[in-house]
Amino acid sequence: MSARRTSREIAVMALYQLELTGPPLKEVLKFKWYDKKTEPEERDFAVSIVNGVVKNQEQIDTLIKKYSKNWDFSRISIVNKAILRLSVFALLYSWEVPKNVTIDEAVELTKEFESEESARFVNGILDAILKNETKSDG
């Protein structure tokens, strides 16, 4: 697994934990709950993702709500919210990864943590956000 993939996986887990139990962000970002060996750069990238999502969460959630047609935001699973938030942050606020790669990675993470059906749901929302809210860069 690539370092970036590991970082995204850690970030999804951290965002999940924040949503589920609401511990202080500082505590979550210590990653004491993550039991796999990671490199400092993997943790640093995960921290930057989580901090970016938390900083921009209101705008991110507004877009997720806008494009999750026929789904009340409260019905979206916590895991799917975490993946969507991470991915919308990457699409709108990060230029490190091509946008199509961001969506592909989100779909794979969703398949890993949730299901094929959830992956289609996440893909649909992210694709709509990509088409309507971002400048295209592939």
UniProtKB/Swiss-Prot annotation:
Pfam families associated with the record: NusB
Single annotated GO MF: RNA binding
CC terms in the record's Gene Ontology section: cytosol
Keywords: RNA-binding, Transcription, Transcription antitermination, Transcription regulation
Biological process, per Gene Ontology: DNA-templated transcription termination; transcription antitermination
InterPro entries per UniProt: NusB-like_sf (IPR035926), NusB_fam (IPR011605), NusB_RsmB_TIM44 (IPR006027)
Biological role: Involved in transcription antitermination. Required for transcription of ribosomal RNA (rRNA) genes. Binds specifically to the boxA antiterminator sequence of the ribosomal RNA (rrn) operons.
Homology family: Belongs to the NusB family.
Listed name of the protein: Transcription antitermination protein NusB
Annotated source species: Leptospira borgpetersenii serovar Hardjo-bovis (strain JB197)
